[in-house]
Each structure stands twice: as C-alpha cells, then as structure tokens.
C-alpha cells in the first residue's frame, strides 16, 4: 500500500473529475511546480493507485436504455470460474461480482430494450448449465454515481 499525502489527494480529486487537467494548471492551484505534479502522478501510477485513464461513455446516448442487475445462484461452488468465463463472452454483461448472501454472482447488464434483455436472459444467461436460478432487478434511475474520495 502506498501512503498518500494531502497533495496526492488533491491531485487525485482533480484527475477523477477530469483526467485531462494540465499539470501546470494543478501546479498553479496547489502552489507547486508542474514537475512536482508529474513526479507525484508517476509515483501513483507505479504504485498502482492510478491504474490508467479512460473515456467515460454515456450509455443512454448510444441507445442502452435498460440497466439491470442479475443475481445468480450457482448449482455448485466449484462452478464460479466456468460461469464467469461464459458470462465474459456476452457483451451485455458489463460488470460481475462474487458476492456473499443470497447470490453467488451479481451482474450488471445493459441492453437497448426490455425485449433485448429478455433475449439475453432466455438465450444466453439462463442456458448456462451451471446456473441454478437468476433474479433480475431493473434499475429505474442511478441517482448516486461517484468515485471514492482519495
């Protein structure tokens, strides 16, 4: 684990809002040199705190109007890896988690329509032999969406 100080925290807060913020702009705002910002960012990259930068896509603008969560109960605990490999091949599955509680695996699935969601469930997910049952929860809204504060 890499210990971070208040300057690192400030840098991370800025970069999580806009990863394209120039180092010179941050340096001016924080009262340090651009070189200091560069060194700090590189140290956080090397330690794995900063994994990379990415484009954030608005799924709705691409027509993905249905977001749902699917709880999966497996027939056997030995089937986790096999099921995950199969789920990885479905483009609609955008996140998967191993969980405690009622479900073995919890998925986030994005589709264009309810009909497409039905198809994904009926012709893909529910045909996986190692799955005992599923429960689908359709998201109405996403009122809180944020990164953790460094």
Swiss-Prot record:
Please give the superkingdom of this protein's source: Bacteria
Q: Output the Pfam families linked to this UniProt entry.
A: AsnC_trans_reg (PF01037), HTH_AsnC-type (PF13404)
Q: Does the keyword DNA-binding apply?
A: yes
Q: Does the keyword Acetylation apply?
A: no
Q: Which UniProt keywords apply?
A: Activator, DNA-binding, Transcription, Transcription regulation
Per the database record, which ranges form the HTH asnC-type domain?
A: 4-65
Name the InterPro entries for this protein: ArsR-like_HTH (IPR011991), AsnC-type_HTH_dom (IPR000485), Dimeric_a/b-barrel (IPR011008), HTH-Siroheme_Decarb (IPR050684), Tscrpt_reg_AsnC-like (IPR019888), Tscrpt_reg_AsnC/Lrp_C (IPR019887), Tscrpt_reg_HTH_AsnC-type_CS (IPR019885), WH-like_DNA-bd_sf (IPR036388)
Record-linked Gene3D superfamilies: 3.30.70.920, Winged helix-like DNA-binding domain superfamily/Winged helix DNA-binding domain (1.10.10.10)
Q: Which residues carry the record's DNA-binding region feature?
A: 23-42
Tell me a Gene Ontology molecular-function term this record carries.
sequence-specific DNA binding
Name the job this protein performs: Activator of asnA transcription.
This chain belongs to the protein called Regulatory protein AsnC
Species of origin reads Haemophilus influenzae (strain ATCC 51907 / DSM 11121 / KW20 / Rd)
Q: What is the lineage of its organism?
A: Bacteria, Pseudomonadati, Pseudomonadota, Gammaproteobacteria, Pasteurellales
- Per the record, the gene is asnC
